[in-house]
Regions:
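Active-site residues of response regulator receiver
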Residues: 52
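Alpha4 helix (beta4-alpha4-beta5 surface) of REC/receiver domains from two-component response regulators
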Residues: 62, 78-79, 89-110, 116-120
Length: 130
């Protein structure tokens, strides 16, 4: 069973996504506080991490950096993990590519997406070697 960590302070949306993904057969961990996520994150435990793009305590990129540092502490070299940023905003991919070229368009998903599209997107990210 594939394992997913969802970190988002938008409780309604994250609970909805958790329910959708559990119904699709995924094992889910949901954390609504990004600072708690930093302390609970275990490298290698999750097939993908879904993170809120804009959160009140820190944005998704800040959390990614913190999780990356946690993964470095485990064995001295960072263990790669897949991440997808969830956002309700319109995404300017060109501007994001200049700031974070390591993330392609597939690493973002709209919070306004339909259930089937969301599950399909998550499955494709888990399956890809990106």
């Amino acid at each position: 069973m594939k394992s997913i960590l969802i970190v988002d302070d938008d409780i309604d949306t994250s609970v909805k996504y958790k329910q959708w993904l559990e119904e699709a057969g995924f094992n889910l961990t949901l954390i609504n506080d990004p600072e708690s996520a930093e302390h609970h994150f275990k490298p290698g435990k999750y097939d993908i991490v879904l993170v809120g793009f804009k959160m009140s305590l820190m944005d998704g990129f800040e959390l990614y950096d913190k999780l990356h540092k946690v993964s470095e502490k485990v064995e001295g070299t960072p263990q790669e993990f897949k991440i997808c940023f969830m956002t309700a905003s319109v995404i300017n991919y060109r501007a994001l590519a200049e700031i974070h070229p390591e993330f392609g368009q597939e690493c973002y998903v709209s919070k306004n997406v339909e259930k089937d599209s969301f599950i399909k997107h998550v499955n494709s990210l888990i399956a890809c070697s990106c």
